[in-house]
Amino acid sequence: MRPLAPDARCAPSRPGRGPWYARRPVTTPSDPPAALREPPPPARRAGKAGSGELVFTRVAGRTVLEKALARSPLKLLAPKNHGQAAWVFVASFGGGLVGGDELNLHARVGRGAAALLSTQASTKVYRSPLVSRQRLEAEVQAGGLLVAIPDPVVCFAGSRYEQDIDVALADDASLVLVDALSSGRSARGERWAFDRYASRVRVSRGGRAVLLDATRLDPAHGALPERMGRFDALATLVALGPRAASAAEALLAPRPPPERRAELVASASPLRGGGAVVRVAGTSVERVAGFLRGALAFLAGELGDDPFARKW
């Protein structure tokens, strides 16, 4: 794990003297030997910019990963293709995003191809005064299908995170997208304790915007634990295009109103040209994951296997 930058806001100081790690130490006879003193805090580090490119192509009735390039700290894992779709898992070196890290990924899904973008585990954002960012730009050509269902983002206390997802679809291309967030490390008492979270999702079809969805959580607008109430996980699900039509239709079907103090609440809205966007809030990540897995059960047929298997 890379060392974290010291948080200057928490450093004790006296007027005119600056933070403790900037002062010259005063040696007295009672000071311990230098070898026994506590080491100084690590120097503030600038984040790293990682980038990647993926190209999926349909060849002889199945999708192949034609191109996969990654620059650290971005890491791409491509398991053996055992179905008609190609799978890629996106990760980062060090087990998460450290202050100032920025990951940019561009993906192109060719005509008639099918691709899955996922993660092996949640995306962890470590505490830092610097903002960590992720950006996904994707293009899906005619008849293609992109399934982007990463695990939830977990923002540690004091962290700052922003992400942008921009998907351009051909007129008859399809998309299944999940954007999910958990309250943090609640088992350690960190519940909605991050300093900033911002996510923007933009989807266009044939050059026309069909969805622009933004989520921003900032304690400057009010204490987050009180605003989020009993919920510990959020998700936005997008199902759009002919290859996701059955899922969109089921999601838009009338359903009874939620019970008082329900452990999961979901609300669906139609999208222009056929499709649905669903916003979900649950009392746990497992509750939200169960809803998503049921809503996206059809993906096993499109991808050759269940993308949620062996995860929860």
From Swiss-Prot:
One Pfam family from the record: UreD
Subunit structure as annotated in this protein's UniProt entry: UreD, UreF and UreG form a complex that acts as a GTP-hydrolysis-dependent molecular chaperone, activating the urease apoprotein by helping to assemble the nickel containing metallocenter of UreC. The UreE protein probably delivers the nickel.
Similarity field: Belongs to the UreD family.
Localization in the cell: Cytoplasm
Role of this protein: Required for maturation of urease via the functional incorporation of the urease nickel metallocenter.
Primary location class: cytoplasm
Provenance organism: Sorangium cellulosum (strain So ce56)
Protein name: Urease accessory protein UreD
Cystine pairings recorded for this chain: none
UniProt keyword Chaperone present: yes
Gene Ontology terms, MF aspect: nickel cation binding
Keyword line: Chaperone, Cytoplasm, Nickel insertion
InterPro entries attached to this UniProt entry: UreD (IPR002669)
Presence of the UniProt keyword Chaperone in the record: yes
Span list, region Disordered: 1-50
Gene Ontology CC, one term: cytoplasm
